[in-house]
């Protein structure tokens, strides 16, 4: 939800979302951080490579200001059927994910989470705004502006240069 329902949100930082443990998280805590926001799934063909590379990217740039926000979603092929606890166990044990895992959300349709409505309206896809599959990635700058959207098949490693640019890292 945006803080003020009468005005359209202008930044990711205006949203409050629920984490996988049921706690509300005000995304304004990420002001000054570069964010990679990803809809994740445990049983997708893209799961292993994406989780592995997201963890590597996070370990490399976390101290420099990168945060990865993972939102489980079961809208694509029912590939995230588990409970929040099961998703946490899977991501944190199998892939050593130390970045935040949020409550399972819808990313498309009338029940889409407000944060995803904002992300999609900020950076539409090649064939419309709707997400086409798991592991669609949104890159957000330190001010909460959505600067890029990447297809599910775009590997996290391949966007490292864009992350570095937003972090102000040369080379």
Swiss-Prot record:
Domain of life: Eukaryota
InterPro entries reported for this sequence: Glutathione_peroxidase (IPR000889), GPX_AS (IPR029759), GPX_CS (IPR029760), Thioredoxin-like_sf (IPR036249), Thioredoxin_domain (IPR013766)
GO CC annotation: cytosol
Catalysed reactions listed for this entry: a hydroperoxy polyunsaturated fatty acid + 2 glutathione = a hydroxy polyunsaturated fatty acid + glutathione disulfide + H2O
TM region positions: none
Cellular compartment(s): Cytoplasm
Protein function: Protects cells and enzymes from oxidative damage, by catalyzing the reduction of hydrogen peroxide, lipid peroxides and organic hydroperoxide, by glutathione.
Organism: Spinacia oleracea
EC class of the enzyme, as a word: oxidoreductase
Enzyme Commission number, as recorded: 1.11.1.12
GO biological process terms held by the UniProt record: response to oxidative stress
A Pfam family: GSHPx
Molecular functions per Gene Ontology: peroxidase activity; phospholipid-hydroperoxide glutathione peroxidase activity
Name of the molecule in the record: Probable phospholipid hydroperoxide glutathione peroxidase
Record SUPFAM superfamilies: Thioredoxin-like (SSF52833)
Active-site residues annotated for this sequence: 44
Record-stated family: Belongs to the glutathione peroxidase family.
Keywords: Cytoplasm, Oxidoreductase, Peroxidase
